[in-house]
Amino acid sequence: MKVIVGLGNPGSKYKETKHNIGFITLDEIAYRQNVSFNNSNFEADIAEFFIGTEKVLLVKPLTFMNESGRSVGPLLTYFGVDEEDLIVIYDDLDLEIGKIRLRQKGSAGGHNGIKSLIAHLGTNVFPRIKIGIGRPSKNDTVIHHVLSTFPKETHEEMLLAVKKAADAALYACEGHTFVETMNQFNGK
């Protein structure tokens, strides 16, 4: 079983914000797979489908970004899923809008959702797909930047990054190792 987690905040207020790019990407995957999200006992909305014989869960934690691990940790334990079968998709300030970067492990890098996952999983070794949201302008704060929507002029680049991230996540679920997936999608 593979588990793809998109990080974001629940509620219509946050639906199209930069911080919700993980949720937006899971919506793209769900659309492609023709599946819908349902509420679960894990403080998350979950959709499921199969790629061949591989069951895939799409997970949107409903705990708000900073408590994502509270949802994901128990879910992985319940389903007996190891961290290497987890893929986390989230926003990254250090990447330009339209860019993605795949990593097998790493620190939280100041991202509170990842910090929560590391704390609840007890490891920083899990595959991740980072989607660029760019840095705030000099007159903007990080909090305002991540909780704002994408400027209209960057919408096309954002959608392209979402599609690339969805492609990468699905590729990893098709029997490819995450190293193969990184080689296929990093720098493209």
From Swiss-Prot:
RNA-binding listed as a keyword: yes
EC number: 3.1.1.29
CDD domains (alphabetical): PTH
Catalytic reaction list: an N-acyl-L-alpha-aminoacyl-tRNA + H2O = an N-acyl-L-amino acid + a tRNA + H(+)
Compartment(s) of residence: Cytoplasm
Any one Gene Ontology cellular component term annotated for this protein: cytoplasm
Pfam families recorded: Pept_tRNA_hydro (PF01195)
Top-level EC class as recorded in UniProt: hydrolase
Main location: cytoplasm
Protein keywords: Cytoplasm, Hydrolase, RNA-binding, tRNA-binding
Residues the record marks as site: Stabilizes the basic form of H active site to accept a proton: D91
Annotated residues for binding of tRNA: Y14, F64, N66, N112
Record keyword Hydrolase present: yes
Annotated catalytic residues: H19
Gene Ontology biological process terms, A to Z: protein quality control for misfolded or incompletely synthesized proteins; rescue of stalled ribosome
Task performed by this protein: Hydrolyzes ribosome-free peptidyl-tRNAs (with 1 or more amino acids incorporated), which drop off the ribosome during protein synthesis, or as a result of ribosome stalling.
Subunit annotation: Monomer.
Similarity comment text for this entry: Belongs to the PTH family.
Protein name: Peptidyl-tRNA hydrolase
Source organism phylogeny: Bacteria, Bacillati, Bacillota, Bacilli, Lactobacillales
